[in-house]
Amino acid sequence: MVIRRLYQFCASHVVRNCSSLKCAQNIHGHNYEVEVFIETNRLDNANMALDFGLMQQEMQVFIESFDHAHHFWDKESLEFQRFIENHCVRYVKCSFNLSAESYALMFLYYLTKILQKSVFSNDEGELKVSSVRVHETKNGYAESFLKDLENPHFKSLVHDHCVSFSQGIQNLWHDKDFFNKIISDEKQCFFHAKPLHQIP
């Protein structure tokens, strides 16, 4: 059984080294759509794989951290990086080139960590993020799968510190340790209470 949740954010970037010069040589933006697919082996007490409302908490906070921000590769010139840091309140510094494929791998990596560190209380089954799709436009998307995180050609692109959020983004997190919890060694960080009203 698989469920899907759609998230959206708007952001700008440059995709260096690609054939499309408009993308490689210019700051430009997209209205991104991120589809997150979660797989389970059984349903919970509400006959759900996972309540969609729970997917509007930590997962949504993480994805919305990329909204209305400029994202840049840490291989950009120092002059360019300093310009962004000095003139943008919201920016994300990334250790990977900013293709849709890289975004898909990155979101899969961090959302998997969030789900693994989440404690649910409504008799949920074994949950995993089976894939993530990232759309830059309506015409195409990149999709990453769990097995991609074991592929040496892919997994070297993503790691605990492959993104760094500006202070302006962090200031809007209700939990100032939000990102540190995601990448910490703690196995349980995000707790979700059992629904109050239950029919036996």
Swiss-Prot record:
Q: Which residues form the active site?
A: C23 (proton acceptor), H68 (charge relay system), E136 (charge relay system)
The record's similarity note reads: Belongs to the PTPS family. QueD subfamily.
Miscellaneous notes? The active site is at the interface between 2 subunits. The proton acceptor Cys is on one subunit, and the charge relay system is on the other subunit.
Kindly state which reaction or reactions the protein catalyses: 7,8-dihydroneopterin 3'-triphosphate + H2O = 6-carboxy-5,6,7,8-tetrahydropterin + triphosphate + acetaldehyde + 2 H(+)
Q: Which keywords fit this entry according to its UniProt record? A: Lyase, Metal-binding, Queuosine biosynthesis, Zinc
Report residues binding Zn(2+): H13, H28, H30
Q: Which GO terms describe its molecular function?
A: 6-carboxytetrahydropterin synthase activity; metal ion binding
According to its UniProt record, which cofactors does this protein need? Answer: Zn(2+)
Cofactor binding note from Swiss-Prot or TrEMBL: Binds 1 zinc ion per subunit.
What biological function has been recorded for the protein in this entry?
Answer: Catalyzes the conversion of 7,8-dihydroneopterin triphosphate (H2NTP) to 6-carboxy-5,6,7,8-tetrahydropterin (CPH4) and acetaldehyde.
Give the originating organism. Helicobacter pylori (strain ATCC 700392 / 26695)
* PANTHER family given in the database record: 6-PYRUVOYL TETRAHYDROBIOPTERIN SYNTHASE, PYRUVOYL TETRAHYDROBIOPTERIN SYNTHASE
**Highest taxon of the lineage:** Bacteria
**Pathway info:** Purine metabolism; 7-cyano-7-deazaguanine biosynthesis
**Top EC class for this record:** lyase
EC number(s) stated in the UniProt entry for this protein: 4.1.2.50
What is the protein's name according to its record?
A: 6-carboxy-5,6,7,8-tetrahydropterin synthase
- What are its GO biological-process terms? queuosine biosynthetic process
